[in-house]
């Protein structure tokens, strides 16, 4: 067994690490948090089986572009499954709908605000630029906060998320708030998100400021922009479940075993993304797995085709690439059940 595998098993076997909020209770509902001079909003779900002196696992769920805190928790099946598995769920709202941007609520991750890709001028791409999109075929979505002359962030018109706040820092503050308010098992904190929220979840896993806070992550129909192929931002393994749609023209996963990047082809945009195979291979290697041909894995969900480079390490692999015959859709409720099952096994 490799050192990484040993560390993973040790993490799984570790006892609960109760937060400072043990002994306290809080009702499900809508709350606010002032962070870096900005009022942030979030919805909280507390399972009926919550006990103030028993540490519970926590999931942070990030909505997609233009969504809000009700995107996941407004779904009855999400609440029912979370209740059944005993998960506290917090769903924050991104920035963008209010002043000064008056655009779509969003989460900012590598390249999304600057408009710059992670691999610069790619010699393998004819006529390539260093942008995350083909600006000739993509509308200008730049937020006013990204065009502020006093602090310009956007390098081109491919920029498409907010520039008002550091979302990684906000996530850290949100987790600290929940940990002070409820009895959270800090060794079992997880992140998931859909579309833009899923892209931000990759950022949380790659960023050294946030990666150590999570036990596992599960991006849904969300991939990093092209060239942002960083492994987990910590030395210990970080399990990941990736769920994508093979008919998705907005954030396509690309063909199996193809390490190339993918391109939006929905008729309105041409954004470039890291392919599902490319990012899962990088994370598989970081998690101590080999890089042969991905092996099939039965996740118990008829709708999905799941494959992994991490077969044989445990009953559930640490990196799992699941694709369903669907478009740019979350696949609720089956995807939420799968996400929680993956978290249970991580």
Give the positions of each predicted feature:
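The feature captures the conserved acid-bearing segment of alpha/beta-hydrolase catalytic domains
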Residues: 50, 211-316, 326-329
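Catalytic active-site module of serine/aspartate enzymes centered on a nucleophile-bearing elbow/loop
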Residues: 334-346
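Structural cue for short, hydrophobic secondary-structure segments
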Residues: 61-64, 91, 243
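A domain-start/cap signature at the N-terminus of enzymes
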Residues: 12-58, 70-76, 84-88, 156-159, ...
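Conserved alpha/beta-hydrolase
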Residues: 86-97
């Amino acid at each position: 067994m490799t050192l990484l595998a040993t560390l993973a098993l040790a993490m799984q076997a570790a006892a609960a690490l109760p937060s400072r909020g043990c002994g306290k209770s809080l009702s499900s509902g809508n709350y606010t948090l002032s962070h870096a001079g900005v009022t942030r909003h979030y919805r909280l779900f507390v399972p009926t089986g919550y006990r103030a002196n028993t540490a519970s696992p926590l999931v942070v769920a990030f909505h997609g572009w233009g969504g809000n805190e009700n995107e996941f928790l407004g779904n009855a099946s999400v609440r029912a499954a979370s209740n059944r598995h005993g998960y506290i769920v917090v769903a924050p709202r991104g920035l963008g709908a209010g002043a000064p941007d008056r655009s779509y609520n969003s989460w900012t991750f590598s390249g999304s605000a600057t408009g710059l890709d992670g691999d610069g001028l790619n010699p393998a791409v004819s006529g390539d630029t260093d942008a995350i999109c083909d600006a000739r075929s993509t509308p200008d979505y730049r937020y006013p906060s990204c065009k502020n002359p006093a602090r310009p962030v956007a390098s081109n018109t491919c920029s498409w998320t907010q520039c008002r706040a550091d979302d990684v820092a906000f996530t850290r503050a949100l987790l600290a708030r929940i940990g002070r308010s409820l009895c959270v098992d800090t060794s079992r904190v997880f992140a998931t998100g859909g579309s833009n929220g899923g892209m931000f979840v990759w950022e949380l896993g790659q960023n050294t400021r946030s990666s150590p806070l999570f036990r596992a992550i599960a991006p849904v129909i969300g991939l990093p922009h092209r060239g942002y192929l960083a492994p987990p931002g910590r030395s210990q393994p970080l399990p990941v479940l990736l769920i994508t749609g093979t008919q998705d023209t907005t954030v396509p996963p690309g063909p199996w075993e193809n390490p190339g990047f993918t391109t939006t082809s929905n008729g309105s945009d041409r954004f470039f993304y890291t392919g599902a195979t490319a990012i899962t291979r990088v994370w598989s290697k970081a998690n101590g797995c080999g890089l042969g041909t991905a092996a099939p894995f039965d996740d118990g969900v008829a709708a999905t085709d799941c494959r992994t480079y991490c077969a044989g390490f445990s009953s559930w692999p640490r990196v799992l690439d699941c694709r369903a015959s669907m478009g740019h859709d979350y696949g609720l409720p089956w995807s939420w059940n799968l996400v929680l099952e993956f978290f249970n096994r991580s």
